[in-house]
Amino acid sequence: MQSTDLGSKESGKIWHRKPSPATRDGIIVNIIHNTSDYLPKVLRFLNVAFDSSGDCLIAGDHHGNIYVFDLCGNRFNLVQRTAQACTALAFNLHRKSEFLVALADYSIKCFDTVTKELVSWMRGHESSVFSISVHGSGRYAITTSSDTAQLWDLDTFQRKRKLNILQSVGIQKVFFLPLSNTILSCFKDNSIFAWECDTLVCKYQLPAPPESSNILYKVFAVTRDGRILAAGGKSNHIHLWCLEAKQLFRIIQMPTKVRAIRHLEFLPDSFDAGSNQVLGVLSQDGIMRFINIQTCKLLFEIGSLDDGISSSVISPHGRYIASIMENGSLNIYSVQTLTKEINKPPPPLVKVIEDLPKKKGNSGDLKVKVTSGRVRRPARSRESKIQTRILKQDLTCGFEKKENELSDGLNKKRLQILLKGYGEFPTKYRMFIWRSLLQLPENQTAFSNLIDKGIHVAFLNLQKKYPIKSRKLLRVLQRTLSALAHWSAIFSDTPYLPLLAFPFVKLFQNNQLICFEVVATLIINWCQHWFEYFPNPPINILSMIENVLAFHDKELLQHFINHDVTSQLYAWPLLETVFSEVLTREEWLKLFDNVFSNHPSFLLMTVVAYNICSRAPLLNCKRKDDFEYFFHHRNNLDISAVIREAYRLLDTTPADIHPDSMLDAFVALTKGQYPVFNQYPKFIVDYQTQERERIRNDELDYLRERQAVEEMQAEVDQQRVEDEAWYQKQELLRRAEETRREILLQEEEKMIQQRQRLAAVRRELKVKEMHLQDAARRRLLQLQQDQREMELRRLDDEIERKVHMRDREIAATAKDLEMRHLELESQKRLYEKNLSRNQEAVAKEMKENADAYRQKVDVEEHMFHRLIGTDQTQNQKIHKLIEENLAKAEQACLNTDWRIQALHKQRCSDLHRNECYQEIAKLLRKNRKKEIEVLNAMMEGEAKKWEEAEEKDFHLKSEKKTAALSDASRRWFLEKEIHDAQHPCDKVVPKGRDEEFASGCLPRASQLNDISEMESLTQISLNQRKMHWDAMEQDLMERVRNLRQRLVTQAQNRCQTPHLLAT
C-alpha cells in the first residue's frame, strides 16, 4: 500500500510508482494531509465526491482546503481554500469543471476547478447542510439541512422551491431518483414521500414498515435504475422497498455484531443494466460489508476495527471506492481487486493428458507431460467457488420450505417430531404453525359482529385496574376482552381473564382476529372445566394437579400441606396467567409451542413439572408469603427441563389419575360462527348478571343523582368561579390601573429626567455658545489690542523719530555753537595779537603793572574757573536729574500701558467696555485740555522769558554805553571780557537746551540772538559785568529750579493719567 502526504504542496503526483493493490485490502493509495509546521498535525478529510466520469474526485478537509484527485492522470491539485470546514460536496454538475461545496456558515458556494474562481454564492439555509443531491442532467440540485430542503437551478443559481416542515419532524434525506424526474423525501418519523420535480406534486407515499421490524430510518440508498430503495438505521435490519410496487419486499438481517448502520450505497456494475445487486453496508464498527441482496451472501468487506471507515463514496462506473477513515486520511480502493476472487472463472472440468513420443525404447526413459486444457465449461457462475456467509440462517430452512409447499396445512406428527428435536418452532414461522395447529377458522364476519357491539361495560375501566403504558395495547386488550364477554356472558365476570389473554394480545396486537380466536381456542380446549365451580377456582382441575403431584413427589406435596399451601397457591396462579408471570417472552413462546402441539392435559402436567423442577427452592420456603412470591415472579429455572419433565409426567402418570382421561381432545372453533360456550353454572352467572344489572341500574340512578348534584355543584362552583373571576378581574384591573399609573409616573419621571437632560444639553450648548462668543470676543479684543499696540508702536516710533530729529537738531546747534566759539576764539586771538602789538610799546612801562595785573588775573581766573566748574557741575546734575525724570516718566508710561492692556483683558461686557471707552475718551479730552493748558503755560513762560531776555538785552545795551566810558581799565576789561564772553555762552546754551527739552524745540533765531547778545557784552566794563553776572547767575539758577519743578509735575501728571482712566 502506497501512502501520499499532501503537506503544503498545491499539486503533485498521487502515487510515485505503479499501484499494485493487495487482494486482501484492495487499497490503491492512502492519502494523508499533515501540516509542515514545527509541530505537525493531521488535517482530517471530511467529505469526498466523484465526478460523473468516475475518474476524478474532490475531497475537503476541516480547514477548508479542497483538492481534486485525477486517478487517471495521477495528479492532485489544490483548487480552493475556503477557510472553513465543508459539510457536503457535489461534483457531478452539467459543467464538468464546477463543483458545489456546503460550508459551516450554512452557505453553498460553486467553484471552478480550472480557473479556481468563485462562480456563485447561494444562501438560504439556517442550519448546517449535510446533503447535496444533483439531478441526472446536472442542472438542478437539492440541498438538505435538518429543518429544510431547497431546490436550486444550477444555470441561474437561484432557489426554485423550498420544503418546510414542522419542527417536531426533522428531515433525514431528500434526493433525486436516478433516471427519473422524481424527488424522494425521507423524514425522521419514517415517512417517505415521492414528489414530481417540476410541479412538486406528491406522487405517492410508501406505507409504514411492519411493527415487528419497525426501525427508525437513518440512511438510504437507491439502485442506478431507481427501482429499489434500501433503508437502515440503528438496527441490524435493512429494509428493501420496491418503488414500482410501493411495498416492502425483503428484510435483510445483518450479523449480530452489526448494531447500527451508518451508510448504505449500491455498487454499480456495467452488466446489470442499473439493477444493482451488491449493496455496501457501513456499520458502527467502521467496517463496510458488501452483500448480495438476492442471495444475502457477504461478498467482501473493507476497513477493520483498528482502521475504521467514517464514510465512503463509490464511483459511478464502480471501479473505485473512496473512503474517509476515522483517523482523517483518505483511502482509494480498487473494486476490481476486491472482487477478483469472486469473479475468477471456475476451474476446468476436463484435464487432458498427452503422451510424448518415445526417444528410446527403454521404459525408464518414458516421460509423460501432463497439461490441463479446457474442452468445455458451463456458464459462469459466481456461486460455484464463493465462500458465502448467510446473514440470517434458520435451522430448518430447507425442511420448512418443503413443508410450506403443502396447501392443506402442516402435519402435526412431523411438527411434534421437529419440536422434540429442536425444542421450539422457528421464530419466523411460529405464528403460521400456531394458526395451523389451532386450526383457526378466521371468522371475520362473526368477529366483526362482536367488535361492533363496542366495549363491554365490564371493561370500561380496565385501565384503572391494569394500567398499561401502551395505549394501543390497552385498546386491543379491551376489544378482545369485550368480544369474549359478548361471545359468552361468563367472561364479563371472570376476574382473571385479562391475565389469561394479555400475553396473546401482546403477541398478536397487530391482528385482533387471530388474537381473539387463539384465546377462544385456548379457553375451549385448555381451560376445560375451569368454570364449573364459578366464581371459585376450578377445584376439579386443581385436584387433578394435586393427584399427579402426590404420585410423583409426595415429599413436596407434604411440604405444601405442612405449610398450609393448597393447590390454589401453587397451581392456580400459574394457570390463570398461563405462566406469563414466571417466564420470559422466549421461554413462554417455547412452552406454548409444546402446549399447542399436545393434548390439553399437557398444560396441567406443565404445572406439576414446574413445581417438581422447583422443589429445592420450594422446600426451603417456610412462610406463605414466600410461596406467593415464588409463584407470581420469575425464577431461575430452565424451561427446557420443565418441558422435558412435563413429557415424562405425561408418559409415566397412571391412567386413573391422568388428566387426559378427564379432559376432552382438542376441538377447533367452528367455521362461519363461533360455538356456544355454556360450560359454567348458568343460574349463578344469571343471578350475578341480574344482580349486576340491578347494581348497575342503582349505580346509574346514583350516577344520575350525583350528576344532578354535581351539575348543581358545578353551577355553584361556576358561579363562585365567575364571581371569583370577576373579583380577580376587578383586582387585576385595579392592579393594572395601579401598574399603569406607576408606569405613567415612571414615564413622567422619565420625561422630567429627559427634560432635565435636555435642559442640561441646552445649558451645555449655551455654555458652548458663550464660550464660542467669549472666544470670538477675546479674539476681537486681541485684534483690537493688537491694533492698539500697533498704534502705540506707531506713536512710539513717531515719538522716537521726533526725539531723534530733536537730538539731531540739538547736535547740529551744538556744533554751530562750537563753530561760533571757535570763530570767537580765533577772533579773540587775533584781537589779542593786535592788542599785544599795540601794547608792545608800552610793555616796559606797564611791566610792573602787568605783574600786578597778572597776579590779579590769576586770582580772578582761578575764581572764574571755579565758578565755571561749579556751574558746569550744577548743569550736569540738572541734566542728569532731567534724564532720570524722563526715564522714570517713560517707565511709568510703559507700566501704565501694560496696566491698560491688562485692564482691557478683564473687560467682559460690551456695555461696560463702551462706557469705559467713553470715559477714557472723556479723560483723554480732559488730558488734552490739560496738556493744552500746560503748553499754553509753557508758552506764557517762554514769552515771559523772552520779555526778561529783552529786559536783559536792554540792560546790556545800557551797560555797553557805560562800558564805553571805562577807557582807563580797557586792558583789564578786554582780558576779563574774554572770560565773561565764554561764561554767558555756557549758561545760555543749557538754558536753551532745558527749555527745548521741556517744550519740544526752540527757534533757532533765539539762540542766534543770544549769541549776538553775548558778542555785545564785550563792551561792558569788568566791574559792572561782574556784579551783573552774579545777579543773572542767581536768576538763571532760580529759573532752572522752577523749570525742573514744572517738568517733574508734568511727568507726575502723565503717570497719574492712566490711573484716572482706569477709574
UniProtKB/Swiss-Prot annotation:
Pfam families: RabGAP-TBC, WD40. Disulfide bonds: none annotated. Residues 1050-1053 are annotated as: Mediates direct interaction with PJA2. Residues 699-951 form a coiled coil. Signal peptide: none annotated. Keywords: Cell projection, Cilium biogenesis/degradation, Coiled coil, Cytoplasm, Cytoskeleton, Repeat, WD repeat. It is found in: Cytoplasm, Cytoskeleton, Microtubule organizing center, Centrosome; Cytoplasm, Cytoskeleton, Microtubule organizing center, Centrosome, Centriolar satellite; Cytoplasm, Cytoskeleton, Cilium basal body. Its main location: cytoplasm. Residues 424-599 form the Rab-GAP TBC domain. One of its GO terms (cellular component) is centriolar satellite. GO terms for biological process: cilium assembly. It comes from the Eukaryota. InterPro entries: Rab-GAP-TBC_dom (IPR000195), Rab-GAP_TBC_sf (IPR035969), TBC1_cilium_biogenesis (IPR051570), WD40/YVTN_repeat-like_dom_sf (IPR015943), WD40_repeat_dom_sf (IPR036322), WD40_rpt (IPR001680). WD repeats lie at residues 33-74, 75-116, 117-157, 158-200, 201-248, 249-296, 297-334. The keyword Lyase does not apply. GO terms for molecular function: molecular adaptor activity. SUPFAM superfamilies: WD40 repeat-like, Ypt/Rab-GAP domain of gyp1p. Molecular adapter which is involved in cilium biogenesis. Part of a functional complex including OFD1 a centriolar protein involved in cilium assembly. Could regulate the cAMP-dependent phosphorylation of OFD1, and its subsequent ubiquitination by PJA2 which ultimately leads to its proteasomal degradation. Interacts with PJA2; the interaction is direct and recruits PJA2 to centrosomes. Interacts with OFD1; regulates its activity in cilium assembly. Interacts with PRKACA. This is TBC1 domain family member 31. It comes from Bos taurus.
